[in-house]
């Protein structure tokens, strides 16, 4: 398997894994941090499985974009590709950090010595903040990546869709609160990102990207 096809598979499979987990995400219906903690604690085994699969997907698409931007560094708009690659390097440890904090949340719920609500809720909130930071760096990388691909004469619709997804991630980083509007914007941004990333993966797999 060529590097380009391996990259393509990561971009296709990566977004699909978290998407499959959303229907069974433990705290999807929670309206507060306390409710989220309770939902996770009600089934710690399911929560562990869901978080693990989802974060494998997160790591997959970040690795896919990392490999893609690495391959784009030579040639037209190579400087932008290099910066995009650096943004992805910065986002990778944040995904690991978020996963670790979510596992720590589950462990804290199960441990009577550290199961104080304030501790558990703080862990969960910090894990979410790490996810926001990931979105910022990944969003910048996607906007730059879209620019590079467009400079390589890749389909204009695809690059525009990818750029919009990146902008959505950047904007979502600066939105705060638990309002329905904020949640809706975040959900729509994630769906848009997932579909655009899969589309990039399909183009790469079919050798439609000029690398």
Predicted regions and their residues:
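Hydrophobic, aromatic-enriched alpha-helical segments typical of multi-pass transmembrane helices
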Residues: 1-211
């Amino acid at each position: 398997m060529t590097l380009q096809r391996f990259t393509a598979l990561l971009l296709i499979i990566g977004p699909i894994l978290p998407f499959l987990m959303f229907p069974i995400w433990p705290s999807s219906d929670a309206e507060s941090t306390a409710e989220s903690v309770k939902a996770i604690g009600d089934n710690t085994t399911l929560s562990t499985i869901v978080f693990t699969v989802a974060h494998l997907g997160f790591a997959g698409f970040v690795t896919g974009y990392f490999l893609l931007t690495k391959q784009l560094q030579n040639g037209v708009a190579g400087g932008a590709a290099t910066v995009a690659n650096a943004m992805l390097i910065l986002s990778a440890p944040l995904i690991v950090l978020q996963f670790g904090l979510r596992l720590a949340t589950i462990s804290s719920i199960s441990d009577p010595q550290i199961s104080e609500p304030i501790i558990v809720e703080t862990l969960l909130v910090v894990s979410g903040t790490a996810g926001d930071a990931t979105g910022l760096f990944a969003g910048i990388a996607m906007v730059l990546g879209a620019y590079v691909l467009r400079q390589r004469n890749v389909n204009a619709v695809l690059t525009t869709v990818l750029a919009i997804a990146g902008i959505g991630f950047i904007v979502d980083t600066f939105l705060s609160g638990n309002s329905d509007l904020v949640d809706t914007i975040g959900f729509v941004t994630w769906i848009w990102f997932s579909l655009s990333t899969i589309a990039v993966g399909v183009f790469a797999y079919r050798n439609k990207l000029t690398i």
